[in-house]
C-alpha cells in the first residue's frame, strides 16, 4: 500500500504501524491452518506462498473503531476476490457491524470469538 501526501496522508508513523499490523495479521494466518509456508484466504481457503494477491481486512472497521486499528487480532486474510466480494455485498453497512463479516465467512469461530470479546 502506497501513501501519497494529500488529504488522506497520515504521516510515516501511521504507515509503519499499518505495515507492522498487516505483517502480524499475515503471520498469524500462517499458523491458522497448520501450513507454515502458506497464507490462506479465510473465506475460500486458497493457499498462497506470497501476500501479493491477499489483503488484510479489519474485523472492526478502521474508521469507526480507532482503538482497535493496530490490534493484530483485529484482522483476517482475504484474497482479492473475496475481499472485493465482501465490500460489494455489504458496502458501508459493514463499517458498524463486524458480525456481517462472520456471516460472510460462514460463522468463522475465531472471528466470532474476537468480536464477542471486544464488543
Residue ranges of model-derived segments:
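Short, charged surface segments at domain edges that flank catalytic/cofactor-binding sites
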Residues: 2-43, 67-69
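Residues immediately within or flanking Cys/His clusters that coordinate Zn2+
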Residues: 38-40, 53, 76
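Short Cys/His-centered divalent metal-binding micro-motifs
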Residues: 49, 75-97
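Histidine-centered catalytic micro-motifs
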Residues: 54-62, 80-86
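Short cysteine/histidine-rich metal-coordination sites, predominantly Zn2+-binding motifs
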Residues: 58-64, 94-103
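Short linker/helix segments within small regulatory modules
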Residues: 60-74
Amino acid at each position: 500500500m502506497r501513501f501519497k501526501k494529500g488529504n488522506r496522508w497520515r504521516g510515516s508513523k501511521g504507515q509503519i504501524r499499518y505495515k507492522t499490523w498487516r505483517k502480524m495479521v499475515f503471520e498469524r494466518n500462517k499458523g491458522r491452518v497448520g501450513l507454515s509456508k502458506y497464507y490462506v484466504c479465510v473465506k475460500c481457503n486458497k493457499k498462497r506462498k506470497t501476500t501479493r494477491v491477499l489483503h488484510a481486512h479489519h474485523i472492526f472497521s478502521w474508521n469507526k473503531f480507532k482503538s482497535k486499528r493496530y490490534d493484530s487480532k483485529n484482522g483476517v486474510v482475504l484474497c482479492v476476490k473475496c475481499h472485493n466480494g465482501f465490500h460489494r455485498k455489504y458496502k458501508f453497512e459493514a463499517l458498524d457491524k463486524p458480525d456481517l463479516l462472520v456471516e460472510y465467512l460462514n460463522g468463522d469461530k475465531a472471528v466470532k470469538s474476537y468480536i464477542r470479546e471486544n464488543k
